[in-house]
């Protein structure tokens, strides 16, 4: 049988030391907690908001931009300026630029297209 010696004064001293360590640990925990919140307060940047707030605002703005883009494309399609290619299921389309009433000029021809154009 092993010999165990219990000394009341030694045990009370040990309890006193542990109480001191508990206080030190709690104060360190409070310091760590304050250090963790300091960067989030300091990282407000030029805009005065946290990164998470800025990212949420950015995402909302991008969603609003995408909705406006889709509304614009829908409106252009309704008035006939934007045509959806046949068989295309994407949101891409071709812009139709009004009817051309004049004559197409041949870039290889330096002079007027007809004799009537020579007088212009």
Curated annotation (Swiss-Prot):
UniProt keyword annotations, A-Z: Secreted
Organism: Mycobacterium bovis (strain ATCC BAA-935 / AF2122/97)
Family the UniProt entry places it in: Belongs to the WXG100 family. ESAT-6 subfamily.
Record's protein name: ESAT-6-like protein EsxQ
Compartments reported by the entry: Secreted
GO CC, one annotated term: extracellular region
């Amino acid at each position: 049988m092993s010999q165990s010696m219990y000394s009341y004064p030694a045990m009370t001293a040990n309890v006193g030391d542990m109480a001191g360590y508990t206080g030190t640990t709690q104060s360190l925990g409070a310091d760590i907690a304050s250090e963790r919140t300091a960067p989030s307060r300091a990282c407000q940047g030029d805009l005065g908001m946290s990164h998470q707030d800025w990212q949420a605002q950015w995402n909302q703005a991008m969603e609003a931009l995408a909705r406006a883009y889709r509304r614009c494309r829908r409106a252009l399609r309704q008035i006939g300026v934007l045509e959806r290619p046949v068989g295309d299921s994407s949101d891409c389309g071709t812009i139709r630029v009004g009817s051309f009433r004049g004559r197409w000029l041949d870039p290889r021809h330096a002079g007027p297209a007809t004799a009537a154009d020579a007088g212009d």
